[in-house]
Structure formats: structure tokens, C-alpha cells
UniProtKB/Swiss-Prot annotation:
Name of the protein in question: 21 kDa cell wall protein
Source species: Solanum lycopersicum
Superkingdom in the source lineage: Eukaryota
UniProt keyword annotations, A-Z: Cell wall, Secreted
Subcellular location: Secreted, Cell wall
């Protein structure tokens, strides 16, 4: 995961 994924809505929590 990366910062972009987090900004997209916390992907792969």
C-alpha cells in the first residue's frame, strides 16, 4: 500500500 491508496479511502486495511 502507499499514501495514494490511503487517500483513495484506506485501501487494503
Amino acid at each position: 500500500s502507499n499514501a495514494v491508496a490511503v487517500l483513495n479511502x484506506x485501501e487494503x486495511m
